[in-house]
Amino acid sequence: MKQDIHPKYTEVTVNCANCGNTFVTRSTRDSIKVDICSNCHPFYTGKQTLVDTAGRVDRFNKRFAKSAASQAQAK
């Protein structure tokens, strides 16, 4: 095997943007930021919460529908 070809595998802190929870894991990255973690995820907490990404999907679908309609009219 070749020596010194593997990335450094160190302990990093993972930060949750939603609830502010932090925990330590190991990774090749310097730091990790997640949108939602097991501390605030609805599946693990049993509480229903709104996730911001749903609005982004709806916005994308609206834009795509407009462009598809304009392409259909052009033909």
Curated annotation (Swiss-Prot):
Signal peptide as annotated in the record: none
PROSITE patterns hit by this protein: RIBOSOMAL_L31
Keyword line: Ribonucleoprotein, Ribosomal protein, RNA-binding, rRNA-binding
InterPro entries on file: Ribosomal_bL28/bL31-like_sf, Ribosomal_bL31, Ribosomal_bL31_A, Ribosomal_bL31_sf
Record's GO cellular component terms: ribonucleoprotein complex; ribosome
Keyword Cell membrane attached: no
Tagged with keyword Glycoprotein: no
GO molecular function terms attached to this record: rRNA binding; structural constituent of ribosome
Disulfide feature: none
GO biological process: translation
Domain of life: Bacteria
Physiological role: Binds the 23S rRNA.
Membership in a protein family: Belongs to the bacterial ribosomal protein bL31 family. Type A subfamily.
Summary of subunit composition and partner proteins: Part of the 50S ribosomal subunit.
NCBIfam families according to UniProt: L31, PRK00019.1, PRK00528.1
Name by which UniProt lists this protein: Large ribosomal subunit protein bL31
